[in-house]
A protein has these predicted regions:
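Short helix/loop segments within enzyme catalytic domains
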Residues: 149-173, 201, 206-209
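Residues on a specific face of well-ordered alpha-helices
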Residues: 123, 143-147, 196
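N-terminal secretory signal peptides that target proteins for export/translocation
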Residues: 1-9
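Juxtacatalytic substrate-recognition/specificity segment
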Residues: 27-138, 155, 171, 180, ...
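Non-transmembrane alpha-helical segments in soluble domains
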Residues: 50, 61, 147, 198-202
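Bacterial N-terminal signal peptides
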Residues: 11-22
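An active-site-proximal "capping" alpha-helix that borders the catalytic cofactor pocket
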Residues: 60, 141-152
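Active-site-proximal alpha-helical
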Residues: 171-209
């Protein structure tokens, strides 16, 4: 693979979070696990986020792959912005090169509850797929599968949006969606349709099929 090729997996994430990363890091509490280093507003949050990331990495790898992932050569930095009314979202970036994947970085934001039960599982699932396949997945499959591990409240949003998009002609034709290698300008239908299709396939074959 082209040594210059890098692939960032980006979930819905306000640009403001990326601009705040440096300021958050300056006043953040730190916590380290085997595979993650966490910067969060408080020591307790940093520990909760790090421990949840490790648990999700272990449990979700078993669900999807049937086995745990080996330890990464370098830990993935997690930058967390946590506030009660902050919209949930995250962005995970990494690099594919020569059949290897490395350079993990994760930015997450939201309320404590949504970070722990939705954002972290979603972003960790991206890293599991990247570690296993070592090449980019179709956008619909990657994002669609990752949304299936979120909290029921987030899944319900995807299902409501799917109906809305189909009724308002914002849906994406399947032949276009299957061919997408980048995010479309109107990205929310990709998430909703990807979730619906991934959910259907999982119900038919299971996660490890």
């Amino acid at each position: 693979m082209d040594a210059h090729f890098s692939r960032a997996v980006v979930r819905m994430l306000p640009i403001a979070l990326l601009l705040l990363c440096s300021s958050v890091a300056q006043g953040a509490a730190g916590y380290r696990t085997a595979n993650f280093t966490v910067a969060a507003p408080t020591p307790q949050l940093a520990k909760e986020i790090g421990d949840t990331a490790e648990r999700c990495r272990r449990e979700l790898a078993l669900e999807w792959l049937g086995q745990e992932l080996p330890r990464w050569s370098r830990p993935c930095p997690i930058m967390a912005q946590v506030a009660p009314n902050l919209g949930a979202g995250g962005a995970t970036s990494f690099v594919f090169d020569g059949g290897e994947v490395f350079g993990w970085r994760m930015n997450i934001q939201g309320s404590r509850e949504r970070i722990l039960d939705s954002v972290i599982p979603h972003e960790i699932t991206h890293t599991i797929f990247a570690s296993h396949f070592r090449q980019p997945l179709p956008r619909w499959a990657d994002e669609g599968a990752c949304t299936t591990v979120e909290h029921k409240s987030e899944i319900d949003k995807q299902e409501r949006m799917l109906i809305e998009f189909l009724q308002t002609h914002r849906g994406i034709a399947f032949d276009r969606m299957f061919a997408m290698t980048e995010y479309p300008e109107d990205v929310l239908p990709l998430y909703a349709q990807g979730h619906s299709l991934a959910h259907y396939l999982i119900s038919q074959r299971g996660k490890a099929a």
